[in-house]
Amino acid sequence: MGQALSVTKVLNAKFHTLEFDGEWLAAVGQPELTGSWMVYGAPKNGKTTFAMMLAKYLSRFCRVAYDSLEEGLSQSIQMSMERVGMKEVGGRVVLLDKEPFGELVKRLHRQKSPDVVIIDSVQFMGLTFDEYKRLKTAFPDKLFVYVSHVAGRQPEGQVAKRIWRDANVYFRIEGYRAFPVSRYKGGATIDVWKEEADRYWGLEES
């Protein structure tokens, strides 16, 4: 049975929040280090590069693992890391080379395991919703960011859609621009590639 908490306890509760600033504060607010986020969009719109930008920014606050199930250790992943200047973060971001669900769970049970895990993608991991709930329950002090393909303008598949509905923050990527929705306020867009975003959205200078 769950706890019944008084209003005073609820209002006095403290949470582990990340002190975002600049464009990330404007986009997301000051989020908790818990639960799930989602990044979704069509191919060739900047989705992977944005996920790398997010990994780099989150590494200012904690350790980040990027589980690349689609591409693994590859030239395209290397190029994405170079594009966002990932060299600056040192050992605070690690790439997991196509690590499956079971191995990821074992890793997260170790001491000094990553605080944030980016799973790229929901579809290539073959994640079930029960496994998703298991991660949330077993690791309540970690943040999971799920990258998803799309069908139309929504995440592809029932599992991805259920994660999307449950996520505290999600970013829709289109035309090299991220459109966030956050339970922590925010809401301002972030450009993955400003020149291409302006061209796509018809804002380029004449």
Task: Describe every region a protein language model picked out.
Residues 1-15:
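Charged, amphipathic alpha-helical linker segments immediately N-terminal to NTP-binding catalytic cores
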Residues 15-32:
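Pre-Walker A adenine-sensing motif
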Residues 33-102:
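Conserved P-loop
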Residues 34, 61-62, 114, 141, ...:
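Short, well-ordered alpha-helix to beta-strand connector turns
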Residues 45, 72-73, 101-102, 122-127, ...:
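Short acidic, S/G/P-rich loop/turn micro-motifs used as interaction or catalytic elements
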Residues 57, 82, 110-111, 134-140, ...:
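Short, surface-exposed basic-aromatic patches at helix termini and helix-loop junctions that form
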Residues 95-147:
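Phosphate-binding/switch loop-helix module in NTP-utilizing enzymes
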Residues 137-206:
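Phosphate-binding/switch region of NTP-binding enzymes
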